[in-house]
């Protein structure tokens, strides 16, 4: 502000009224001028749809085709896309760079107000499908650095650029690189390791998980390196990465460490590739669990479903199929209900050559919208209409926890054929399926729960009253978690433990006949485990509770007996300080999942957990799911009916809220206490 209008003539004994009026008038004038300048320079940010798709760019495409795809995105209110930035399509053999193909895509995106997330995709041998996961050599690393410099500096000023995906789908499926470059990195990493005080009571450690620990480090190191390279040329760049095969690769992801260099965390969610341990009718629930895992991994960062299957499998996919329009709708609302900021389909258009050629697309071979694209557009329109970004997921204080070491031990233990269905609990994937069963059972009560790595749980709270941890099938419980878990129960938390959870420590050292470290909080230790191939039932509160493979009995020292068969104690409850534990060392999760009868497990869980959520089903609803979101005193409930017939479900709702249907793809309806859905329908209700 001009000092002439502030410095009054203090040497005068008296101020003239006219001078004061002039001073005030000038102040008001300058204030108004400042406000006017602000309102003329600050522009409203353009709306970016939560829903978008991959536009696959490759040589041979015409300008008209490229323009058509971005026009289609805009017309369907899906103005966010992802492009794989192939180095092979930019760099000539003589070392010169030609970005003209991708410039056309960026110009088309600008023309139709579509934002682009560019996936960095440097050159490497055999690199057409998912991309390589680590550099092959120091020379390759330097080539990648040159590629990043070229691409980022060229495109960083484009108005269409939203951000960068650091690499496509990190994660090797547990395979540990053994090339010279990786071994050099491993040698450097080993020098940083500190000796641990815990040594499994001095027993010989004949199982070595150092390779798995290195892979966990190596994935993080490479992502951090890429992020640093991008930031050299674009310090304010938006950085993202998409995990994949979450129910197996989860053991090589250190999400809390990734938060240090990411702007958001994402997931690829292709049922035909990634959900093969589930039946098709469970794909929507599997996506919900996938979202819960990524939401937890992201922490305070946003999370995306970076790739979602959009079209048909011909030769690709482990369990090939073509999603229906109803499934597309279910998957979108499942992602939104879990809080996904963006959902991008793979793909809008099919690639023309190589792996997946002619597959996966939302458009047909004449570039016309399929019913899947139309369905996605209807969801996008609704999301904009209700301003969905203002609603946040309501998630119960129920934490289904997993350990990476469980997956390492499970894989190490595979000595024989692991495809025999009678032994599913000990096959690869058994642990995560058992944990998934807990998630599914709660969801079929309308309760959305947390699905988290032990490292992502907040172990530093003074009180855990009202919170529940579920350990289902987590066979390895590392020593570093024993005291935090004890503190959780001590300070008011509820621990539910089933199956052979805590059977081993991190070194595959059996804990129960060598002095069980959690005997104080559980009130006992395992007495024996009997292998009963296939399935069996246990009588629990005058009803049969399905279980699978392992029947554990408890050496009970302090617990209250809950289930007993003859002299065998099968389940106990124990008060420890301000908290409580409930222990049932048989595979209940897999028992419910395999039998397709979750009602008995549902009764057990609802009796043991505190689910302080505003909306629930009045009774267990097999095959029906509900997610709840909240904005102030308004709620969204998202219901999905996977039953083969129409259904009416009774709802437990807050007092004083009234329903209005904002989305129903098959004419569903709602009253103040019920919802009616056709088979395969998604129904979204606004309550206020």
Model-inferred region functions:
Residues 472-688:
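A conserved amphipathic helix/loop scaffold
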Residues 66-139, 143, 217-233:
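Aromatic-lined substrate-binding rim segments of carbohydrate-active enzymes
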Residues 60-73, 144-151, 247-258, 324-332, ...:
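Short, acidic/polar
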Residues 51-61, 86-99, 129-143, 170, ...:
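The substrate-binding groove and active-site-proximal loops of carbohydrate-active enzymes
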Residues 135, 146-150, 154-289, 293:
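Polysaccharide-binding and catalytic clefts of secreted carbohydrate-active enzymes
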Residues 240-243, 248-436, 528-530, 540, ...:
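Hydrophobic targeting/anchoring helices
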Residues 42-80, 389:
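N-terminal carbohydrate-binding accessory modules
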Residues 440-461:
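A short, well-structured beta->alpha microelement
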């Amino acid at each position: 502000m001009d000092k002439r209008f502030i410095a009054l003539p203090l040497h005068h004994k008296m101020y003239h009224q006219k001078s004061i009026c002039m001073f005030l008038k000038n102040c008001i004038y300058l204030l108004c001028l400042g406000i006017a300048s602000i309102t003329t320079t600050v522009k409203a940010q353009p709306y970016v749809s939560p829903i978008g798709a991959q536009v696959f760019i490759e040589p041979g495409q015409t300008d008209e085709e490229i323009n058509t795809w971005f026009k289609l995105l805009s017309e369907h209110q899906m103005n966010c896309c992802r492009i794989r930035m192939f180095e092979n399509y930019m760099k000539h053999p003589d070392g010169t760079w030609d970005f003209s193909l991708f410039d056309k895509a960026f110009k088309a995106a600008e023309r139709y107000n579509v934002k682009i997330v560019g996936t960095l995709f440097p050159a490497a041998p055999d690199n057409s499908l998912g991309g390589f996961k680590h550099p092959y050599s120091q020379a390759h690393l330097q080539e990648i650095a040159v590629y990043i410099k070229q691409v980022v500096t060229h495109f960083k000023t484009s108005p269409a650029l939203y951000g960068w995906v650091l690499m496509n789908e990190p994660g090797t499926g547990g395979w540990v690189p053994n090339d010279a470059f990786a071994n050099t990195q491993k040698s450097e990493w080993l020098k940083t390791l500190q000796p641990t005080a815990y040594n499994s009571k001095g027993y010989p450690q004949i199982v070595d998980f150092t390779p798995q620990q290195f892979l966990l480090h190596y994935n993080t190191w490479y992502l951090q390196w890429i992020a640093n390279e991008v930031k050299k040329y674009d310090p304010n760049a938006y950085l993202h990465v998409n995990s994949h095969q979450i129910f197996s690769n989860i053991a090589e992801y250190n999400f809390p460490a990734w938060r240090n260099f990411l702007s958001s965390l994402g997931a690829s969610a292709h049922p035909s590739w990634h959900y093969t341990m589930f039946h098709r009718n469970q794909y929507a629930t599997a996506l919900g669990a996938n979202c819960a895992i990524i939401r937890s991994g992201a922490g305070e960062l946003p999370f995306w479903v970076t790739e979602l299957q959009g079209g048909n499998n011909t030769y690709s996919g482990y369990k090939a199929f073509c999603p229906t329009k109803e499934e597309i709708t279910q998957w979108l609302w499942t992602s939104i209900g879990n809080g996904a900021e963006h959902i991008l389909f793979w793909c809008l258009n099919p690639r023309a050559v190589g792996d997946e050629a002619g597959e996966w697309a939302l458009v047909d071979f004449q570039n016309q919208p399929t019913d899947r694209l139309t369905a996605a557009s209807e969801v996008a329109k609704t999301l904009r209409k209700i301003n969905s970004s203002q609603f946040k997921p309501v998630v119960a204080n129920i934490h289904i926890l997993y350990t990476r070491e469980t997956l390492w031990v499970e894989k190490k233990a595979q000595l024989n054929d692991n495809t025999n269905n009678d032994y599913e609990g000990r096959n690869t994937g058994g642990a995560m399926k058992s944990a998934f069963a807990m998630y599914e059972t709660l969801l079929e009560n309308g309760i959305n729960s947390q699905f988290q790595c032990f490292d992502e749980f907040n172990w530093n709270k003074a009180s855990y009253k009202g919170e529940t941890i579920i350990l289902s099938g987590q066979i390895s419980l590392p020593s570093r978690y024993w005291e935090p878990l004890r503190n959780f129960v001590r300070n008011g938390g509820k621990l539910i433990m089933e199956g052979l959870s805590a059977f081993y420590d991190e070194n595959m050292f059996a804990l129960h006949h060598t002095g069980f470290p959690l005997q104080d909080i559980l009130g006992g230790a395992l007495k024996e485990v009997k292998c009963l191939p296939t399935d069996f039932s246990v009588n629990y509160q005058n009803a049969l509770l399905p279980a699978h493979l392992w029947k554990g009995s408890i050496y009970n020292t302090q617990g209250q007996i809950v289930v007993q068969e003859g002299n065998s104690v099968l389940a106990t409850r124990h008060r420890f300080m301000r908290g409580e534990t409930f222990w049932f060392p048989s595979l209940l999760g897999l028992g419910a999942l395999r039998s397709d009868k979750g009602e008995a497990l549902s009764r057990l869980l609802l009796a043991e957990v505190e689910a302080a959520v505003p909306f629930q089903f009045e009774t267990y609803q097999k095959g029906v799911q509900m997610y709840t979101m909240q904005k102030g005193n308004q709620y969204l409930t998202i219901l999905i009916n996977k039953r083969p017939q129409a259904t009416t479900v009774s709802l437990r709702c807050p007092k004083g809220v009234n329903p209005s249907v904002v989305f129903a793809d098959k004419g569903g309806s709602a009253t103040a206490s019920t919802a009616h859905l056709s088979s395969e329908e998604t129904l979204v209700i606004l309550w206020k």
